[in-house]
Amino acid sequence: MMPGQIPDPSVTAGSLPGLGPLTGLPSSALTTEELKYADIRNIGAMIAPLHFLEVKLGKRPQPVKSELDEEEERRKRRREKNKVAAARCRNKKKERTEFLQRESERLELMNAELKTQIEELKLERQQLILMLNRHRPTCIVRTDSVRTPESEGNPLLEQLDKK
């Protein structure tokens, strides 16, 4: 029968090979009402041969107690290992965070000290320039051989230019 075709009412249970539960029915013609309930009526006939095999339908076979205990023990060990690994990971992360915090504080302190040192050096430079400018009018050294701080460039660049 093709999909979408209407079944022929004259079909008998015996004429259809392998209809599952209907195979135990007599091969006489069945009405549509009988066909509806044939599965339900013959379920007992289907289960009866399986009964001697001690097959329980709808239930899984229960594992042996020792298998359950072993499985439970494995789960406990796995959970315990996972718990220890998670604690180790949290501790490592905490230590790393603390290290980075200390390093950040150290670098901020160093940065502040360097900025202070820069300000002190700028102030010292200003004082030296002021002293030099005060001394210049009374200086007996030739002025064309002395450079003024304002006309000074970068001494490293000047040395490179000479080469």
Swiss-Prot record:
Residue span(s) of domain bZIP: 72-135
Gene Ontology MF, one: RNA polymerase II cis-regulatory region sequence-specific DNA binding
Post-translational modification remark: Phosphorylation of Thr-148 by MAPK8 in response to different stress conditions such as, UV irradiation, oxidatives stress and anisomycin treatments. Polyubiquitinated; probably by IRF2BP1.
Residue ranges of the region described as Disordered: 1-20, 59-89
Gene3D superfamilies assigned: 1.20.5.170
UniProt keyword list: DNA-binding, Isopeptide bond, Nucleus, Phosphoprotein, Repressor, Transcription, Transcription regulation, Ubl conjugation
Superkingdom classification of source: Eukaryota
Protein name per the record: Jun dimerization protein 2
Record keyword Ion transport present: no
Protein source organism: Rattus norvegicus
Region (Leucine-zipper) location: 100-128
Cross-link (Glycyl lysine isopeptide (Lys-Gly) (interchain with G-Cter in SUMO2)): K65
Main subcellular localisation: nucleus
BP GO terms, sorted: chromatin remodeling; fat cell differentiation; negative regulation of fat cell differentiation; negative regulation of transcription by RNA polymerase II; regulation of transcription by RNA polymerase II
PANTHER family in alphabetical order: FOS TRANSCRIPTION FACTOR-RELATED (PTHR23351), JUN DIMERIZATION PROTEIN 2 (PTHR23351:SF10)
Region (Basic motif) location: 74-96
Top-level taxonomy: Eukaryota, Metazoa, Chordata, Craniata, Vertebrata
InterPro entries: AP-1, bZIP, bZIP_sf
Positions of post-translational Phosphothreonine modification: T148
Quaternary structure and partners: Interacts with IRF2BP1. Forms homodimer or heterodimer with JUN, JUNB, JUND, CEBPG and ATF2 thereby inhibiting transactivation by JUN, ATF2 and CEBPG. Binds multiple DNA elements such as cAMP-response element (CRE) and TPA response element (TRE) either as homodimer or heterodimer.
Role summary: Component of the AP-1 transcription factor that represses transactivation mediated by the Jun family of proteins. Involved in a variety of transcriptional responses associated with AP-1, such as UV-induced apoptosis, cell differentiation, tumorigenesis and antitumogeneris. Can also function as a repressor by recruiting histone deacetylase 3/HDAC3 to the promoter region of JUN. May control transcription via direct regulation of the modification of histones and the assembly of chromatin.
Keyword Signal in annotation: no
